[in-house]
Amino acid sequence: MNDDARPAPEPQDIPPHSGAADEVNRQDPSRRSVLWTTAGVAGAGLGLGALGAGTASAAGRSAPDAVAAAEAVAAAPPRQGRTMAGVPFERRSTVRVGIIGLGNRGDSMIDLFLALPGVQVKAVCDTVRDKAEKAAKKVTAAGQPAPAIYAKDEHDYENLCKRGDIDFVYVVTPWELHFPMAKTAMLNGKHVGVECPIAMRLEELWQLVDLSERTRRHCMQLENCCYGKNEMRVLRMAHAGLFGELQHGAGAYNHDLRELMFDPDYYEGPWRRLWHTRLRGDLYPNHGFGPVANYMDVNRGDRVVSISSVGTTPLGLAAYREEHMPAGDPSWKESYIGADRTISLVQTAKGRVIRLEHDVSSPHPYSRINSLGGTKGVFEDYPERIYLEPTNTNHQWDDFKKYAEWDHWLWKEHANPPGGHGGMDYIMVFRLMQCMRLGLVPDFDVYDAAVWTAPVPLSHLSIKAKGVPLPIPDFTRGEWKKTRSGMDSEKPAE
């Protein structure tokens, strides 16, 4: 045990290691209907009903019906606990980690946890035992004791979450499993970090917010793009006023994934492709939305209030299948409804506009757009370029490299970080583990996770209703009006 860590507050109402917690899991319909296997994911029949009662019934109705359904879910239910905004972690000398999911992403991310001092990987879990054993060998190769392995069945992750020697659970599994796994981790007294998106239904987002507040456990969307070098530089410049009063921004996940989604070996089964048979909207808003929301202090002085979405005809995946997949391939049984490109306009309480795009099924170069504009100028990424008054007055883009002095301290401290995605993965894991060790407030919280993910179900509804604006819930229940720190941290004393 960590002898210098204060005992973690137990979840209110439901002791984390009691039979009551198990009973809650057994009663959760999402836990019953979704199996953590390729066959379970494919056969679970997660169509529109997976979005919740409001979404399923409104999907094919009129715009007024869609608005009514969204408003019903947007209304904040009574608070069950206390806000988690600004709540620090408990200080500890060592962060003990359990990892659920060791496919492509999990297998690479475990290396980053093992590279950090003061971090121990205590348990690993995957339904494919070979993957769990491979991860366990990495742990011992790093000089740590052999971790416990959980690979018995699709429910074995529950036993990992029940362990008394884990502080933080990292969830790296198919999207439909993120919600039940995050929920189980918090019910068992663990802080939890989840890959994108954190859930697929508005009702699930509210449940995670409420459970985080009630259990006093942090539930975070581990959004690595918030830690990109350019993103963190723009953040500091924006908060220093170089862009003037912020007016607009844009973010995207435009990434041609057709080959990977039809590759039988890259993903563990067709789970990612199958979401294009279920939803029409933006399936992956977080990479683009998170950084722009940070620039604008969303949940920390401003909030997003509505979203309006449109989408193109779904042609890309079917065309790729026609050209590349043999007759008899299981994919020929699939009917794709997901728009090749979705475009959403998000309005904030202060009148700012955020444009979100999503396109993984047509040919194009990679781009997250990552733009920000204000009364003094604008930045756009892919390629990076900037135009700021009074320096720029000739209507020509300027070199963003000139602004290196505004790099975040994390990038000055770790100039050439290891790991994937240009080093942002390492920066994210380093900072999260630092916050947990030193007892700091996390850079983002459950409210950010919920806001960044809300476009998943809402964009689908809006597209079905011909682009009608829909309300985005205030997951903070009014706490957004209070100015507080976020990603723009200063280097802490160790």
Curated annotation (Swiss-Prot):
Residues 1-58 form the signal peptide. PROSITE patterns: TAT. InterPro entries: Gfo/Idh/MocA-like_OxRdtase_N, Gfo/Idh/MocA_oxidrdct_glycsds, Glyco_hydro_109_C, NAD(P)-bd_dom_sf, TAT_signal. Residues 1-32 are annotated as: Disordered. Keywords: Glycosidase, Hydrolase, NAD, Signal. NAD(+) binds at residues 104-105, 126, 175-178, 195-196, 224, 284. It holds the Pfam family GFO_IDH_MocA. Binds 1 NAD(+) per subunit. The NAD(+) cannot dissociate. Gene3D superfamilies: Dihydrodipicolinate Reductase, domain 2 (3.30.360.10), NAD(P)-binding Rossmann-like Domain (3.40.50.720). Substrate binds at residues 253, 272, 284-287, 366. One of its GO terms (molecular function) is nucleotide binding. Its EC number is 3.2.1.-. It is an enzyme of class 3 (hydrolase). Predicted to be exported by the Tat system. The position of the signal peptide cleavage has not been experimentally proven. The keyword Lipoprotein does not apply. It comes from the Bacteria. Belongs to the Gfo/Idh/MocA family. Glycosyl hydrolase 109 subfamily. Glycosidase. This is Glycosyl hydrolase family 109 protein. It comes from Streptomyces filamentosus (Streptomyces roseosporus).
